[in-house]
Swiss-Prot record:
<dbReference type="InterPro" id="IPR039657">
    <property type="entry name" value="Dimethylallyltransferase"/>
</dbReference>
<feature type="region of interest" description="Interaction with substrate tRNA">
    <location>
        <begin position="45"/>
        <end position="48"/>
    </location>
</feature>
<keyword id="KW-0808">Transferase</keyword>
<dbReference type="InterPro" id="IPR018022">
    <property type="entry name" value="IPT"/>
</dbReference>
<keyword id="KW-0460">Magnesium</keyword>
<feature type="binding site">
    <location>
        <begin position="20"/>
        <end position="27"/>
    </location>
    <ligand>
        <name>ATP</name>
    </ligand>
</feature>
<keyword id="KW-0547">Nucleotide-binding</keyword>
<feature type="site" description="Interaction with substrate tRNA">
    <location>
        <position position="111"/>
    </location>
</feature>
<comment type="similarity">
    <text>Belongs to the IPP transferase family.</text>
</comment>
<protein>
    <recommendedName>
        <fullName>tRNA dimethylallyltransferase</fullName>
        <ecNumber>2.5.1.75</ecNumber>
    </recommendedName>
</protein>
<dbReference type="InterPro" id="IPR027417">
    <property type="entry name" value="P-loop_NTPase"/>
</dbReference>
<feature type="region of interest" description="Interaction with substrate tRNA">
    <location>
        <begin position="275"/>
        <end position="280"/>
    </location>
</feature>
<feature type="binding site">
    <location>
        <begin position="22"/>
        <end position="27"/>
    </location>
    <ligand>
        <name>substrate</name>
    </ligand>
</feature>
<dbReference type="Pfam" id="PF01715">
    <property type="entry name" value="IPPT"/>
</dbReference>
<dbReference type="GO" id="GO:0005524">
    <property type="term" value="F:ATP binding"/>
</dbReference>
<dbReference type="GO" id="GO:0052381">
    <property type="term" value="F:tRNA dimethylallyltransferase activity"/>
</dbReference>
<comment type="subunit">
    <text>Monomer.</text>
</comment>
Length: 347
């Protein structure tokens, strides 16, 4: 469903969300929309924030950026961390500046946690503590991640049932919260959802950082939000695109890009930047842990899994208009039904 903007145009400025799985054609559609609408693009991609990671993240080309500049890309060094809270702060500032000039913020990407953080805000869980995380990492190296999962099972059985022992990021977060607050992380889920022990199995990331999944909190974002999700109707079409794009990245020099990152000497495969899909598999291959064919197969498979997770989030998303085609006219026709064209004069 697209909101009827006619009753709100005097109070809330519009913004457009263009969401979708990787390789669905979001960038091309966004650039086309900028030709017709007074839009300015804000990237919603947790990998594109990093400088020097261009090929493997499918960043817009210099030619595309000249046509439609993107905000929130190339803003971090790969050695740094960039959180959903950081994104929310930066995106809100960019949206305010864009709408203040009478233009429309167009948020484009597939990092669904970022979209959710923007719509619903962050949970009241504590921020990450780097010193404590380093301590937990040392314990894991000494005793194994299985020992940490056993600790979680003892202190927070609800969380242990949902967090797989191999999901190191979520396991570390759960242990971190317990040690920072002396409370099980599941107690935060319960207080936010209003229930006890009832958590869907859709992914632990739904709960480790955010408020309850389907809470009616979108009014907290001071915009009239028009939400679109772009994805092929046939999963096989998306899978084919993913494979072709991964192979094209390799031809474009993706492995040389990762070699340059490894040669810096200050990066490791445990950093969030190097855990990005494709980079993690390339690091393993260049470290001699995989043969080339296995690397390619794992890179494609990991990208497909990413797309599957993105689609899982989107299928639960409220008030979203699904697009099977990257035809900008479909978006424009939908926006016209809301009355938006009377304010911004587009056909």
């Amino acid at each position: 469903m697209i909101p009827d903007n006619r009753s709100q145009q005097g109070s809330l400025p519009p913004t457009i969300f263009l969401m979708g799985p990787t390789a669905s054609g979001k960038t091309d559609l966004a650039i086309e929309l900028c030709r017709t609408l007074p839009c300015e693009i804000i990237s919603v991609d947790s990998a594109m924030v990093y400088r020097g990671m261009d090929i493997g993240t499918a960043k817009p080309s210099p030619e595309e950026l000249a046509l439609a500049p993107h905000r929130l890309i190339d803003i971090c060094d790969p050695a740094d961390t960039y959180s959903a809270a950081d994104f929310r702060r930066d995106a809100l500032a960019a949206m305010s500046e864009i709408s203040g000039r009478g233009r429309i913020p167009l948020l484009v990407g597939g990092t669904m946690m970022y979209f959710k953080a923007l719509l619903h805000g962050m949970s009241n869980l504590p921020s990450a503590n780097q010193a404590l995380r380093a301590e937990i990492e040392r314990e894991a190296e000494r005793d194994g991640w299985g020992a940490l999962h056993e600790e979680l099972a003892e202190k927070d059985p609800d969380a242990a049932r949902l967090i797989h022992p191999n999901n190191r990021q979520r396991l570390m977060r759960a242990i971190e919260v317990i040690r920072l607050t002396d409370k099980p992380i599941s107690s935060f889920w319960q207080s936010e959802s209003g229930t006890s022990g009832q958590h869907p199995q859709s992914g632990i990331e739904d709960y480790t950082y955010f408020t309850s999944w389907q809470a009616d909190e979108s009014a907290g974002l001071p915009y009239t939000v028009f939400q679109f999700a772009l994805a092929p109707a046939e999963r096989s079409v998306l899978h084919s695109r993913i494979q072709k794009r991964f192979l094209a990245m390799l031809e474009a020099g993706f492995l040389d890009e990762v070699r340059a990152l490894m040669a810096r000497g200050d990066l490791s495969p445990d950093l969030p930047s190097m855990r990005c899909v494709g980079y993690r598999q390339a690091w393993d291959y260049l470290s001699g842990n995989e043969d080339y064919d296995s690397f390619v197969a794992k890179g494609v498979a990991a990208t497909r899994q990413l797309a599957k997770r993105q689609l899982t989030w989107l299928r639960k998303w409220r008030d979203v208009h699904w697009l099977d085609s990257a035809d900008p006219q479909v978006v424009l026709d939908t926006l016209k039904k809301s009355g938006l064209h009377t304010t911004f004069n587009f056909e």
